[in-house]
Amino acid sequence: MQTKPFRIGTRGSPLAMAQTHETRDRLAAAHGLPPEMFEIVILSTKGDRITDRSLAEIGGKGLFTEELEQQLLSGDLDFAVHSSKDMPTKLPEGLFLSAFLPREDIRDAFVGRSAKRLVDLPQGATVGSSSLRRQALIRRLRPDIDVITYRGQVETRLRKLAEGQVDGTLLAYAGLRRLGMEHVPTELLDPEEFPPAPAQGAICVEARIGDDRINTLLAAIDDPRTHEAVSCERGFLATLDGSCRTPIAGYAQSDGTHIRFAGMILTPDGTTSHQIEIDGRAADAERLGQEAGERIRAKAGPGFFSSWS
């Protein structure tokens, strides 16, 4: 019988804390445990501390996970809670993504200062985003506006917008909903036209391979449909060596038996893009994503990535 609290690792941002509290509450309810049986351990990551440069410049997605993973591997944490889209496709040896919570809305949200929609921004307007995918998609749709790198927590980005530093910004709608800020967006973007990042809107829990006690605990909150969809999307990303240096979009939908995936790769300036759609058995989700990646890479040709990466 567990007598000491389970130690949950997380970043300290308001969004990370909201995701961790949701995970803790689901675990407590699933196992009939009081919330006090889960101790939340807040760690600062390099990605949190360096906010004046793009992720591509300072090392990519692993900057939000490295400190948490070190504590997991040392045994100081029992598991860690992350935004799935922040996770590198290659994890440290001995760790894996044990569980995925039911997925939130996958869409991107536009927040405009004056213009309510992305298409309504005047020529020469400025939009801030830290995501190469969002930057490329904006340039694809609106080559007449300026896109600047714009990092920070959700609240920081919205404050900069209110101060007039930019005319608009894009945020994951899932994050806004988790923060109780679903009223903030002025437009929700159609994923057919503005596809999300792979794994966007999904919370994942990272744990040690072979830690049966913890992984049995986490299995109670794992959502199979989300697990299948995100596995497919991460398979696509991994095949394309996806990181914060690559504009890659994609999302999968699973009904438990069948899964459909749509993906896109773009040049950073948004002038060239390639798309892929594929479907298959949900049981083959990761392999299906890998196949989609192989097909779109062949479609784009060998010079596509080397021409700008």
From Swiss-Prot:
Binds 1 dipyrromethane group covalently. Keywords: Porphyrin biosynthesis, Transferase. It holds the Pfam family Porphobil_deam. It is an enzyme of class 2 (transferase). One of its GO terms (cellular component) is cytoplasm. It catalyses: 4 porphobilinogen + H2O = hydroxymethylbilane + 4 NH4(+). GO terms for biological process: protoporphyrinogen IX biosynthetic process. The modification S-(dipyrrolylmethanemethyl)cysteine is found at C244. Its EC number is 2.5.1.61. Its cofactor is dipyrromethane. Pathway: Porphyrin-containing compound metabolism; protoporphyrin-IX biosynthesis; coproporphyrinogen-III from 5-aminolevulinate: step 2/4. One of its GO terms (molecular function) is hydroxymethylbilane synthase activity. Belongs to the HMBS family. The porphobilinogen subunits are added to the dipyrromethane group. Monomer. Tetrapolymerization of the monopyrrole PBG into the hydroxymethylbilane pre-uroporphyrinogen in several discrete steps. This is Porphobilinogen deaminase. It comes from Rhizobium meliloti (strain 1021) (Ensifer meliloti).
